Amino acid sequence: MSIFLLLVGLPISANAKSAEEDRQEIREMRSEVLAQLYQNNPEAKDLIAGAEGYAVFNNGGVNLILLSAGSGKGVAHDNKSGKDVFMRMATGGVGIGLGIKDYRAVIVFHKRAMFDQFVDKGWDFSGQADAAAKIDDTGGEANAADSVVSGVTVYQMTKKGLALQATLQGTKYWKVDKWNN
């Protein structure tokens, strides 16, 4: 029986990514997102360079009538120490909407206390209204997203998806021990 359980579990563990593979995937995502941000908003480069820190996340989300949910992963970078903190995120909310959206977010922290709170406690509560339509490299997007917290600038870029929504969302960000050891 124990041999059977070992063999059944083998394919799952053989396909599991190592912590370094996860970190590398997140670093590559960060590089791509920042390149896209700087191309679309050149002023963001100086804003990020002068900030206490920033975070970059990918997020896939679904909005069905009155409920929305999503999850993703990313990294918070401390500009003063140069340290990266690898994290996950999950969102949930209520509001009117319909669609699926794959987007990237860059969160810029202008105050040290805000960056430290984000990394240590990880909560954000946002109101969001947007319309996005983008499939592959076609389509367009229009976003109006702003954190309720002052001292923070948020950029959102839709990668793929189609969504029309007006939601009140809670987002939880947290450190992933496996990725930070």
Task: For the regions a language model picked out, list residue spans one by one.
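Signal peptide processing junction and immediate N-terminal pro/mature segment
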Residues: 12-16
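Small-residue-enriched, tightly packed secondary-structure blocks
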Residues: 17-181
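Bacterial N-terminal signal peptides
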Residues: 2-11
